[in-house]
Regions:
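C-terminal catalytic "cap/lid" subdomain
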Residues: 1-171, 175-201
Length: 201
């Protein structure tokens, strides 16, 4: 039935897990092997950092001294989203005298369009748009990173030891991402590989 869309009821799997009962899912009239669901190690107990991801050809955009008011972020990002421009790292600084700086990263290919779109928004009041190419995103990838203290600090220390300047930072449950200069990518990756012993089994 699973092929036709039937699903295991979440409550049945939950009870099986609580009482450590293995669940075997198979077709009634098929001789093919089914799926055995058993209790295993928690993901958070496995090796946390599993790899490093690199994304080059990244640009940084900073809107200087934009009026801080409800809906400001949406008024900046929605016109870009409407044009299918993907935004990744987003940083908004603390308001000063009612104004903020708003920064984000985009691909190099979209940078020209971003500037034109921002300049065409009559409802946005800002002092300047600063943009630059030559950046890359380096991500520490793993499982259960949100529950593993110290990994972000270790990453930042490793980059700092190589005099790598971190431009922007973002985190999620499975990654910690830093925006750095593209020229610093090679030494950054080597340093992180060494710090987290990714070359070892």
């Amino acid at each position: 039935m699973a092929v036709l869309g039937a699903k295991m009821h979440p409550r049945s799997i939950e009870l099986a897990s609580v009482y450590n009962v293995p669940v075997y899912v198979a077709g009634t009239f098929s001789k093919k092997k089914g799926t055995l669901i058993t209790k295993g190690d928690d993901m958070e107990n496995n090796k946390t950092v599993t790899g490093i991801a690199i994304d080059k050809n990244v640009s940084k955009v900073t809107i200087k001294k934009i009026k801080n008011k409800p809906g400001t972020a949406a008024s900046i990002l929605k016109p870009l989203s409407d044009q299918s421009i993907s935004i990744d790292i987003i940083v908004q600084n603390i308001p000063m005298d009612g104004y903020i700086d708003f920064s984000f990263s985009v691909s190099d290919d979209d940078l020209g369009r971003v500037y034109d779109i921002l300049m065409s928004q009559g409802n946005l009041e800002f002092e300047d748009v600063i943009q630059g190419k030559g950046f890359a995103k380096i991500s520490l990838v793993g499982t259960g990173m949100q529950n593993a203290p110290g990994y972000a600090t270790d990453m930042f220390n490793a980059l700092g030891e190589e005099n790598v300047e971190i431009e922007m930072i973002t985190t999620s449950e499975i990654r910690i991402t830093c925006l750095v200069k593209e020229e610093d990518v090679e030494k950054s990756v080597k340093s992180l590989h060494s710090k987290f012993e990714l070359d070892k089994d």
